[in-house]
Amino acid sequence: MEDVFKGIEKEIIKIYKIPERKGRFSNFKFKNKEINELIDALGFKLYLHQVKALKYLYNKKDVVVTTSTASGKSEIFRLAIFDNFLSNPDDRYLLIYPTRALINNQYEKFSMENELFYKITNKRVKAEILTGDVGLEKRREILKDKPNVLFTTPDMLHYQILKNHNNYLWLLKNLKLLVVDELHVYRGVFGTNMVYVFKRLLKLLKRLNNNLQILCLSATLKNPKEFVKLLFNRDFEVVDKSYNPSSRKYLAILEPKNLDNKQLLRRLIENLVDNNIKTLVFFDTRKETEKLMRFLLNSKVFYKLSTYKGTLPKYVREEIEEKFKNGEILALLTTNALELGIDIGDLDAVINYGIPPDGIFSLIQRFGRAGRRDKEALNIIVLRKDGLDYYYKEHLNELYERIRKGIIEYMPVNIKNRFVTKKHLHYLISELKIVDFDELNDFEKEIVKELEREGKIKIYKNPITNKTEIRNVKQPIYSSIRTASDESYYLILDKPWIKSKLLNKTQSEILSFINWLKIKGYVIEEVDKDEYYRSLITGMPYFSRGKLFIAKDKIGIRKFHFIFADELDMFWDVEALQKKEEEIDILDIYDKKSYKDIDIYYGRLRVRKIYEGFIVRGVDVDKYYQELLALKDNGILDAEIDLFKDFFGLNFISVKFNKKIIRDFETDGIWLCYFQIILGMLTK
């Protein structure tokens, strides 16, 4: 411990010790004795909470298991699947995970146990992965082979299985168990979308006379019963106490005093790496990971570090994960991409830069990653100059208690989001062909009437049944359940032959070509629309894993966008700041509340972002200026480019677009009006 904080002792506010916990074990009698043999072969004993969950499952109950990180939740469904497979080999199982990385990780674990299961029983459970990475040929193979277990994402359940449910009747008619892992991530707009994705699934299964069971797995929630009721409109049995052993942990709170934030993080990381301590360093944004990585370019431990982001190609992420597992890399600078349970081997320490925007929620998940193999763990928070950080600095004991208990207290899901509800009701009507109007709640009936006014569906009285029914008129366009856009943006090394090949590909060929480019290392990152406008407009510098790139031209082919980039000297010190304006129009007000003299509105907004250019600052702007001039000379960058220098060395480049870039979109939002307060201030 002393070595970890050597040279930064004065930055420590407080260190807490979280005591170790002993495990409690129990036994369970499976239908088939081979499963008990499998447990023996795996070399573990069942924890008491695993046995409680299994008892509920075997009594035909829906179950939510909300226990601490690394408490063996996944073992519950794996054992239940293997057991039921021996008795009912035609049953099917759908396993939902929020990320592809987590699916790959869990599929690997399932496959390892499946091999042991085969050695014991001479039978193997057929399991497949269905994600956006899976090509058309493999998808056809899945439909032909009809695996027992399907690992998939919420997105593929929405886009693929429900949209094309006639192709998946072999799965849906025989679906015995739906497993939803990492349930706690289903919050915010994503959570609202998932309420309706699950509603569509359950209504379809009801049509198919399938009353399946649901098993949900989650980090520790304060209100699990209410939360799963909100998501599924079903009653669940709750298992919410962990009986797995837990190692001793330390929680250290640091605040930059004599050092600035970057210097403190650097010293801390260097001390941890010098002591061979495997560490994750969490940041709120991808940009922050890259900024610190660049600050560490001349550090003695630089080659033991890497950034890790969800935007990196799959093969790059897997390469980083493997190097971290075997100790070639000792510290990862990451975002929430590693917040979930991806297996990266033993982990000794977690640093979080500040309190995350969602408060303690993410801290609990991140800190749960360290000390997962009966080893002591060190959790560190480096406070920022931020409102939330200031609050917890003044309430350290509250922070400690909430982390120690590991309970996520608040899960915001708004089930009355009109925009989301309207989309999913249209999908539902399209998928089921006919929907009983009276099966909808009052809010949904109101939305359906809007859809009828828009000419998308028809409400009519069935003369035979005398029921009011809804039929589809216009096919819906399926959009993302995570973002407002379905478009994909790829940052690619600039090679002329790639451009010519892309322009001659069909849509189905493009997906295969993109995967080939990823494997060959030409794809630097895959980003979303927001990140493109934020960081990758032509001429802007972009950092990835410590390397420096300059964004060049972009070509768009339907929903695919390709930004070409050149790699520059990684040691150049440059940074871009955008020049933009924002205009907001209020389209609709859904709700209004008042607090004292403040009016709080919730409604629909139209946002217009006007990008006028950007500024580049840093030590090496002279060199970067030449790169920008080359882009202009080649007709790639249509802008006025000026280099400004002053006596103090505060040099910068101003890039002003000759044609402003405009981005329009609609979103739900909250806004405040406090006219009376402002009026009072002006009066004074």
UniProtKB/Swiss-Prot annotation:
Keywords: ATP-binding, Helicase, Hydrolase, Nucleotide-binding. ATP binds at T67, S68, T69, A70, S71, G72, K73, S74. Residues 264-419 form the Helicase C-terminal domain. GO terms for molecular function: 3'-5' DNA helicase activity; ATP binding; hydrolase activity; nucleic acid binding. A motif (DEVH box) lies at residues 181-184. SUPFAM superfamilies: P-loop containing nucleoside triphosphate hydrolases (SSF52540). Its EC number is 3.6.4.-. PROSITE patterns: HELICASE_ATP_BIND_1, HELICASE_CTER. This is Uncharacterized ATP-dependent helicase MJ1574. It comes from Methanocaldococcus jannaschii (strain ATCC 43067 / DSM 2661 / JAL-1 / JCM 10045 / NBRC 100440).
